[in-house]
Amino acid sequence: MTDLVVEDGSIVGANVEDLESTYRIDAKKTIIATGGFTRNADLVAKYAPDYTSAFPFTGAGGTGDGHVMAEKLGAPIIGSGMMGLSGINPSLGYYGPIGGAVWSAQMTVNAEGERFMDKKFYGDTLALLVEQTNSCGYGIYDASNEIVDRLEAGVEAGVVAKYDNLDDLASGQGIDADALKKQAESADIKSAPFYCIQRKPLFIGSIPGIKVDEHCRVVNGAGEEIGNLYAAGEVMYANVFDGTYPASGSGVGTSCYTGAISARDALAALA
């Protein structure tokens, strides 16, 4: 889709293109369900400037097309923050035998050697990481960890660092050694060898979105309905939650029920 077709202030369809041609689709009702903008660095800088150090771990289609089109029509983009967690890199993220090792850190510290993450509420992980020096947390493990075999595989892959002692770990990773050792003692991390994974901030979704009413109808800056236009799913998340990722399932759940709300309202209007 390249843009929406407007007649007399209402949406009557969309202009689209494929590999061979450009054409118009007429529609009595249009629902924007284009997802987020995690794959569009310019929109991240525009709508969530505090999060430019994070990388996307999302589908390739999250380029924010719906946000751009709606804003051109006068619809406000509301909300702040991004949805995200921590991962190793854009390929491994936090999945699989190696990527998933980020979840098993015995503690995570910043470059100052301070623990800053709450294991009980991981929804704040992204927001906390981007605030740290180098936008990075350091997951610390020792030989007693139950996933040592996976850590060793990570060492072989070049994404997990292994050290004989905590002083070498601190030096190798640029962490304050005294603070690190103090935190390690409190966490009972004492069995050599020691391992470290750099936990980087990653996106799993975006929050800022198109402003809608309770029927998921898109509205303009004055709160007036833009005729025949709806928004559902990630493209309008900020109407439901804002700032940080509330909990697992928040995005999928919101997408399901806003899709149903918008579709039911559109069908009722056409009946």
Residue ranges and their predicted role:
Residues 66-76, 173-176, 181-184, 253-271:
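Internal hydrophobic alpha-helix adjacent to the cofactor/substrate pocket in enzyme cavities
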Residues 101-103, 204-206, 248:
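Short, small/polar residue-rich loop motifs at catalytic or cofactor-binding pockets
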Residues 18, 24-89, 252, 261:
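Glycine-rich loop(s) and the adjacent beta-strand/alpha-helix scaffold that form part
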Residues 3, 179-243:
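A glycine-rich dinucleotide-binding beta-alpha-beta segment and adjacent secondary-structure elements
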